[in-house]
Amino acid sequence: MKAEIPITWAEVVDSTNSWASREMSVIDKMSVFAALYQTAGRGQRGNKWHSATGENLTFSIALRFGNSLTGNVRAMDQFVLTEVAALSVADFLSDKGADVRIKWPNDIYVRDRKICGMLIENSLRGDEVATSIVGIGINLNQRDFPAELANPTSLAIATGKEIGPKEALEDFLPFFLMRLEMSLTTEGRAEMRNDYLDILYRKDKPFPYRDNVTGEEFTGTIKGISDIGELLAEMPDKSIKSFSFKEIGYII
């Protein structure tokens, strides 16, 4: 897919997702908003996203659906946007030499350490996704992290290679556009699901988890994901249980 995607860079913003949200009304198909530093970067579950100034890649992709570039996404199929985002980052990092896995739903890990986090915010119109803001933070060159971050890593730590944020974004976007194009067809979506499962973190091996609904800890085995993107885990009694976002915690 060849497309000219508008990219706007800022030295400092509150958060790229908030910035993209403020600009959404004038976005036709797709635009990218990137910053060298965020004063209030946001992650999943309301967590703050930490990134040293200029050392990492923090950006948001704003998408409007119902056109030739983005296609149409039913609300019940919106997990495909998670697959597009996670796989495109995995493609980019793999191309740079990192051995990555996707920690459900969309964190990217190198071994047991987090190299990328995402915050995807969708708005619906009826039973269709109207817009999506895909916020992505990739640790590129940072080597020293705050002590409160439990398990961070970066491309520099994982591979010994450094790359500037602007160059990294230019290198990343073709992977995103390729995965977005795959999402336009049934065959492409099926291929993406297989690609996602192929690099799903901890798949088919027993590990400790926490049921965040009951508070109980258990040893389970991730078997895959459901049609709507729930995590499927084999429980100690060999039954298969589905978990929605925030319902399961990884004990690492």
Predicted regions and their residues:
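Long, positively charged amphipathic alpha-helical accessory segments at protein N-termini or as interdomain linkers
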Residues: 2, 66-100, 110-252
